[in-house]
Each structure stands twice: as structure tokens, then as C-alpha cells.
A protein has these predicted regions:
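MPN/JAMM (Mov34/JAB) isopeptidase/deubiquitinase module and associated MPN-bearing subunits/adaptors
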Residues: 1-80, 84-180
Length: 180
């Protein structure tokens, strides 16, 4: 399974995760899906998410209301959700799903996890082993991983974001040139 992130979705995930760092964000993913590809067009943050440092709980009734609103007003579908993991004390954030993440994972949907940590040196955006997208923004290290649940089994999906790899790399080249 491949999970494509559009420019809007990629920026949405970054802004949403960085805004609340070191707390954790939660939101829904809008887009469309085919049997082996999911296209994420938008990442929409939930303002009502009761953000704690370790876990994010949301009001599930409200979530259903949002899904119905999306279905009746846009051509996109709710294809899954996302949340961030933040560095906690000395423990660095990872993109691994917690037990609670697994419990709340709905069948047939995609779950994106954005891990945010402090970092000293900027790092170009690239794909790392297992299909994770990794890079940095303004002193924060970001890793974006995706999972997909089918037949009651949660598997890792490959994150694909031409925008992140191409455009961000060019930006960093320009930046490097301008400081030399
Ligand atoms: Zn989690």
C-alpha cells in the first residue's frame, strides 16, 4: 500500500504537528483511495482534541459528525486520521503505533503518525527504510509514517511525497547557497 501526500497534506501535517509541539495533534485525512494507493489531499486538524503530552483523546461522536459533514460537502472522503508523537522528557518520539493507537485504528483506513524531535543540524528530506518520510524544518526533526488496516491487520504503508522530496530539497539548496 502506498500513501501519497499532496503538497497541501504535507504542509498541513507539518504545521499541525509543529504548532502544538511538544503536545500532540490529531486530525482527519481527506482524499480518495484505490485498492493499492491512497491519495491524501488535505490534513484537517481537530481543534477539539484534548491534547495531552502522551496521548490524544477525541470526542468520537463529534468525529462522526465531521465525517458526515465532509461526505455531504466535498468530493473527498475521510480516508483516515493522523496524529503526532512528540519528544517526551529524554525519550525521543518514534513513529511506532502505541497500544491505544492500535485499539482506535478503524478497518479500511489509513493512520499517519508524525514524530517530532529537536534536532541540531538540518537534514534534507528523504525516504528511509520501511517507507517513512524523514527530514527537518527549523530545528525540528520530522518523521512521517503511514499504516493501513485491512482484514484486522495493521501494516506499514509507504509514504510518497514528491513535493517534500523535490521542492524542499531545492529550497534547502538555495538556503545553503545563500549562507555560503
Ligand atoms: Zn500515537
Amino acid at each position: 500500500m502506498e500513501v501519497y501526500l499532496s503538497e497541501n497534506a504535507f504542509i498541513g501535517l507539518l504545521v499541525s504537528a509543529l504548532e502544538v509541539y511538544r503536545r500532540e495533534c490529531f486530525g482527519i485525512l481527506l482524499g480518495h483511495s484505490t485498492p493499492d494507493r491512497v491519495f491524501v489531499e488535505f490534513a484537517v486538524p481537530y481543534q477539539s482534541a484534548n491534547r495531552k503530552y502522551r496521548e490524544v483523546h477525541i470526542d468520537w461522536k463529534r468525529s462522526q459528525r465531521v465525517e458526515e459533514a465532509v461526505r455531504s460537502t466535498t468530493r473527498w472522503e475521510c480516508i483516515g486520521d493522523y496524529h503526532s508523537h512528540s519528544k517526551f522528557g529524554l525519550r525521543r518520539a518514534t513513529t511506532q503505533l502505541s497500544n491505544e493507537d492500535k485499539q482506535h485504528f478503524s478497518e479500511g483506513t489509513v493512520g499517519v503518525v508524525v514524530a517530532v524531535n529537536d534536532i541540531r543540524k538540518p537534514r534534507p528530506w528523504s525516504y528511509v527504510k520501511g517507507g517513512t518520510l524523514s527530514g527537518s524544518v527549523n530545528g525540528y526533526s520530522i518523521r512521517i509514517a503511514a499504516y493501513y488496516k485491512s482484514n484486522d491487520h495493521i501494516a506499514r504503508a509507504h509514504v510518497v511525497s514528491p513535493y517534500a522530496i523535490g521542492f524542499m530539497e531545492k529550497r534547502q539548496d538555495l538556503f545553503r547557497r545563500s549562507i555560503q
